[in-house]
Each structure stands twice: as structure tokens, then as C-alpha cells.
Amino acid sequence: MKKEGILNSELAKIADDLGHTDQVCIGDLGLPVPSGVKKIDLALTRGKPTFQEVLDIYLENILVEKIYLADEIKENNPEQLKILLTKLSADVEVVFVSHETLKLMNHDVKAVVRTGENTPYSNIILQSGVAL
């Protein structure tokens, strides 16, 4: 049994298998998951686990070179955005796209991780970097 790192076996497998430029999405309760894309449903109740809790686990365990966020988060959930941006290293590229574009991008991610988050536009696509 692992005693640290990502303990959830499905989350760990996705993180372990990410190659350079591979992507994983962390989403809120309402984010649709495209047919054929792996869904890891962590939602226990409304609000648990939070988007930030799940994001923290991935940021601690994978090298992220770029993130994608819905542009709508700026106006509709600025506090979530503010907290999120403070967690990123300075070299992470931040790209804002429309929420519709973000949903379309989910067709190409390795997995969508569903949290219990119930605040608007709490969705992110993490793009894996390379440690060379």
C-alpha cells in the first residue's frame, strides 16, 4: 500500500501514464464528459471533494506546462481563479478559451476527473510537461 502521493489508483494511473503534452481535465459537478473519454468520478456530495483539493493533488504530482481555463471564470468565479493562479509556478502558460471550446477539448483528454465542486466554471485542463 502506498503511504504518500496519489492514493486513488485511478488518479495515480492517469498521472503516471501522462506523457509530454498529454492532458487531463479536472471538472465541477456539471461538466459533461464526452462519450469514450475516461471519467473518474470523485464526487461524494455537493462540494466534496472541492476542485481545489483535487487540483492540489495533481499539481503536487505531475509537471504541468500549460493550463486551459474557461474565459467565463474571470467574471463568474473570480475567487476560484485567484486561488488557482497563486498555485501555479511562473513558467506555466495560462490559456483562456470559451467554455464551449473547453468542453470540445475534453474529447482529447486522457481523463475527466469529476469533483463535487458546485461553483461555476471550476474546470481546468492540465497539459503535462517534460522533465528534461
Curated annotation (Swiss-Prot):
Its EC number is 5.4.99.62. Keywords: Carbohydrate metabolism, Cytoplasm, Isomerase. One of its GO terms (cellular component) is cytosol. The active site is at H20 (proton donor). It holds the Pfam family RbsD_FucU. Signal peptide: none annotated. Substrate binds at D28, H99, Y121, S122, N123. It is found in: Cytoplasm. The keyword Metal-binding does not apply. It catalyses: beta-D-ribopyranose = beta-D-ribofuranose. GO terms for biological process: D-ribose catabolic process. GO terms for molecular function: D-ribose pyranase activity; intramolecular lyase activity; monosaccharide binding. Pathway: Carbohydrate metabolism; D-ribose degradation; D-ribose 5-phosphate from beta-D-ribopyranose: step 1/2. It is an enzyme of class 5 (isomerase). NCBIfam families: PRK11797.1. Belongs to the RbsD / FucU family. RbsD subfamily. Catalyzes the interconversion of beta-pyran and beta-furan forms of D-ribose. This is D-ribose pyranase. The lineage of its organism: Bacteria, Bacillati, Bacillota, Bacilli, Lactobacillales.
